[in-house]
Amino acid sequence: MARYLGPKLKLSRREGTDLFLKSGVRAIDSKCKIDTAPGQHGARKPRLSDYGVQLREKQKVRRIYGILEKQFRNYYREATRLKGNTGENLLQLLEGRLDNVVYRMGFATTRAEARQLVSHKAIVVNGKVVNIPSSQVSPEDVVTVREKAKKQARIKAALDLAAQREKPTWIEINADKMEGVYKRLPERSDLSADINEQLIVELYSK
């Protein structure tokens, strides 16, 4: 399955919530009718079956983190092998992706932009350049913008924007040094209440 390259707001309207795919403190404004389907005359969304609700939730989370279907299923399988709650394990695995951590630290305005920074070798983890967006970051890992990339205007703009957002409690950030520490795995209470991971567990458990 190819990565979606179309209008970002269309995806948010399809899922009925802001997926934070566009840069900005909040991507959705009053002009975007989030409760209607995509299109100029988008109809209100029909009532979904239980399966439809579960599928939509999985699609929503997959799109938030920019994960393809096969990758997402692999994350779920890994989550089932870990101790503890499968749904929470899944979210922690997604949050631990390097591209997501770069986004959370404020070095990029979107996860897609963070993925590009990683792929272009602009990110260093524990002193070593890492160019695989899906690399898992572990507690106490130090993530830094590579020295020659620190002059990029988009990174400075992203940090300015991040200063207006609530900072993740599980990440320590030094904006001046363009460096951050992934202090711990996020707890469920740290993450969005708009995600119902149990629906995803129910979907894949069938």
From Swiss-Prot:
**What are the UniProt keywords, alphabetically?**
Ribonucleoprotein, Ribosomal protein, RNA-binding, rRNA-binding
Q: Which domain of life is it from?
A: Bacteria
Output the InterPro entries linked to this UniProt entry.
Ribosomal_uS4 (IPR022801), Ribosomal_uS4_bac-type (IPR005709), Ribosomal_uS4_CS (IPR018079), Ribosomal_uS4_N (IPR001912), S4_RNA-bd (IPR002942), S4_RNA-bd_sf (IPR036986)
Tell me a Gene Ontology molecular-function term this record carries.
Answer: structural constituent of ribosome
What are the S4 RNA-binding domain coordinates in residue numbering? Answer: 96-156
Record's PROSITE patterns? RIBOSOMAL_S4 (PS00632), S4 (PS50889)
Any GO CC annotation of this UniProt entry:
small ribosomal subunit
Keyword rRNA-binding carried by entry: yes
Q: Where are the transmembrane segments?
A: none
A Gene Ontology biological process term: ribosomal small subunit biogenesis
Question: According to its UniProt record, which protein family does this protein belong to?
Answer: Belongs to the universal ribosomal protein uS4 family.
Q: What does this protein do?
A: One of the primary rRNA binding proteins, it binds directly to 16S rRNA where it nucleates assembly of the body of the 30S subunit. With S5 and S12 plays an important role in translational accuracy.
Q: How does the record describe its quaternary structure? A: Part of the 30S ribosomal subunit. Contacts protein S5. The interaction surface between S4 and S5 is involved in control of translational fidelity.
Q: What is this protein called?
A: Small ribosomal subunit protein uS4
Species name:
Tolumonas auensis (strain DSM 9187 / NBRC 110442 / TA 4)
The lineage is: Bacteria, Pseudomonadati, Pseudomonadota, Gammaproteobacteria, Aeromonadales
Give the gene that encodes this protein: rpsD
